[in-house]
């Protein structure tokens, strides 16, 4: 038997197995620490399965896969769907860096509530002038500042969703590099327009959006992706920020800078990928 792939989503794995069954290919699902494994009994069918898998990874939510489950008369796997607590779900979908940044942001936000924004910003904000340039933590620490509950919830939700899958699939070092690079460049871009009076993880989040989306489009075998609809919404939200539609103070330059950095890093990292969008 040959292991074909590991998929984190059991329902998607079942849909692919059922779809291949309609092509007279028998696949088996087995539990795995990262989700489930799909195994092929007949090695002679491997090339056909790999071809269909490529198509599946490009569009796993295509109705033909769900329709195959109904045709096979099997909409559930024999594997149990376990119930997890919110904390277990949070931890299972994130690595140590993802969780550490979340804890750090929450701790700093609580400190800002207690001591006031300016007291914390005096230590962590983007360098105010050249005398602070050697305080190198400032080039990144501004990303951990948040000024409202909605601000921190929105950013940490995206950070967990995108950073978690990136760290799980590509490793902690890859996420660390993207976080540092995007924090520096998004902070620099925003400082050109607002000085040092800004903060938030959104520049890094937009870098993650760009990286995860483009990597998923060009190299789906890496196992990370952002649905096109969510990416389109994010771009529209970015554009809306320039028109002050919601009356919010938005770090537009940080968003744009972060998105560009994420796209550039993803393009570079997938430059040798054989699977690109046609």
UniProtKB/Swiss-Prot annotation:
Gene3D superfamilies hit by this protein: 3.30.70.2350, Rhomboid-like
Subcellular location: Cell inner membrane
Pfam families the UniProt entry points to: Rhomboid, Rhomboid_N
Enzyme Commission number(s) from the entry: 3.4.21.105
Catalytic reaction equation(s): Cleaves type-1 transmembrane domains using a catalytic dyad composed of serine and histidine that are contributed by different transmembrane domains
GO MF, one annotated term: serine-type endopeptidase activity
Active site: 202, 255
Membrane topology: Multi-pass membrane protein
Keyword annotations: Cell inner membrane, Cell membrane, Hydrolase, Membrane, Protease, Serine protease, Transmembrane, Transmembrane helix
Class of this enzyme: hydrolase
Top-level taxonomic group: Bacteria
A GO biological process held by the record: proteolysis
Primary location group: membrane
InterPro entries, per database record: GlpG_N_sf, Peptidase_S54_GlpG_N, Peptidase_S54_rhomboid_dom, Rhomboid-like_sf, Rhomboid_protease_GlpG
GO cellular component terms given for this protein: plasma membrane
Transmembrane segments: 94-114, 143-163, 175-195, 196-216, 224-241, 245-267
Listed NCBIfam families: PRK10907.1 (NF008155), rhombo_GlpG (TIGR04239)
Family affiliation: Belongs to the peptidase S54 family.
Function per UniProt: Rhomboid-type serine protease that catalyzes intramembrane proteolysis.
Protein's name in the database: Rhomboid protease GlpG
Gene name per UniProt: glpG
């Amino acid at each position: 038997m040959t292991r074909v792939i590991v998929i984190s989503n059991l329902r998607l794995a079942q849909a692919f197995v059922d779809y291949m069954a309609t092509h007279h290919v028998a696949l088996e699902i087995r539990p795995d620490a990262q989700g489930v494994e799909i195994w092929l009994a007949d090695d002679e069918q491997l090339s056909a399965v790999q071809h269909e898998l490529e198509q599946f990874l490009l569009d796993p939510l295509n109705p033909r896969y769900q329709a195959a489950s109904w045709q096979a008369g099997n909409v559930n796997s024999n594997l149990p769907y376990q119930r997890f607590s919110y904390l277990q779900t949070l931890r299972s979908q994130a690595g140590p860096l993802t969780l550490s940044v979340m804890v750090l942001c929450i701790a700093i936000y609580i400190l800002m509530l207690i001591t006031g924004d300016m007291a914390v910003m005096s230590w962590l904000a983007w360098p105010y002038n050249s005398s602070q340039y050697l305080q190198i933590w400032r080039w990144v620490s501004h990303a951990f500042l948040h000024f409202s509950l909605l601000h921190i919830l929105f950013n940490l939700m995206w950070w967990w969703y995108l950073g978690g899958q990136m760290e799980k699939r590509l490793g902690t070092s890859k996420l660390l590099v993207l976080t540092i690079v995007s924090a520096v460049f998004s902070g620099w871009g925003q400082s050109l327009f607002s000085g040092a009076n800004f903060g938030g993880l959104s520049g890094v989040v937009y870098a993650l959006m760009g990286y995860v989306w483009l990597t998923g489009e060009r190299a789906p075998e890496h196992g990370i992706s952002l649905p096109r609809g969510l990416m389109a919404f994010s771009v529209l939200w970015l554009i809306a920020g320039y028109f002050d539609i919601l009356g919010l103070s938005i770090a537009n330059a940080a968003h744009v800078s972060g998105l560009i950095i994420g796209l550039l890093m993803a393009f570079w990292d997938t430059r040798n990928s054989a699977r690109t969008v046609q």
